């Protein structure tokens, strides 16, 4: 058994090795009004699918923490890129920089973007979220990740991955859409 101490409430519980953080969160029955988005495990932020094999201190994070908000925003960016891929297969979105409590994005769809386009994207994002599609973290060899992104036409990511020098990498997948954050 592994011992997990929850920083949020100070309680410690025993779990079977290999338990994921979502299961740990459920077992502690925390009342987080904004929902949990990630967790700090021994001071390192991890996703809720992270599996625990040794004793750990865990602090669950929601959007009221800086790290939790960054996780939430990255998830929304992923949903945005999925919506644009679905609606405009040849389109491209470039997420640039924070500005005025939001982010500046450059959307290229081969013509000027209209308010109807924005409404369509917003509606499709809401549909993706309502469908409760899981965002999966895929761990694999870096060569496999490079092949995956090469097939997706993401030379920017293949270049980045080929220069890391790491044997293993990870990427995220949402209903067939792959991305790297």
Predicted segment positions?
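Non-catalytic interaction/regulatory segments
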Residues: 99, 108-181
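Ubiquitin-like/PB1-type beta-grasp interaction modules and other compact soluble beta-rich domains
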Residues: 1-77, 81-99, 123-127
């Amino acid at each position: 058994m592994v011992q997990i101490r929850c920083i949020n409430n100070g309680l410690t519980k025993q779990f079977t090795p290999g338990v994921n953080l979502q299961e740990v969160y459920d077992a502690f029955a925390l009342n987080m009004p904004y929902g949990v988005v990630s967790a700090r495990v021994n001071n390192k932020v991890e996703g809720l699918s992270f599996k625990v094999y040794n004793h750990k201190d865990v602090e669950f994070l929601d959007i009221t923490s800086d790290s939790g908000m960054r996780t939430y925003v990255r998830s929304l960016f992923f949903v945005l890129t999925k919506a644009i891929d679905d609606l405009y297969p040849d389109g491209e979105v470039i997420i640039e920089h924070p500005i005025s409590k939001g982010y500046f994005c450059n959307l290229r769809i081969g013509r000027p973007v209209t308010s109807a386009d924005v409404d369509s994207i917003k509606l499709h994002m809401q549909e993706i979220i309502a469908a409760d599609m899981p965002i999966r973290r895929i761990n694999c060899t870096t060569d496999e990740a490079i092949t995956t992104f090469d097939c997706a036409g993401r030379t920017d990511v293949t270049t980045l991955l080929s220069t890391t020098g790491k044997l293993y990498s990870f990427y995220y997948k949402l209903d067939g859409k792959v991305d790297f954050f």
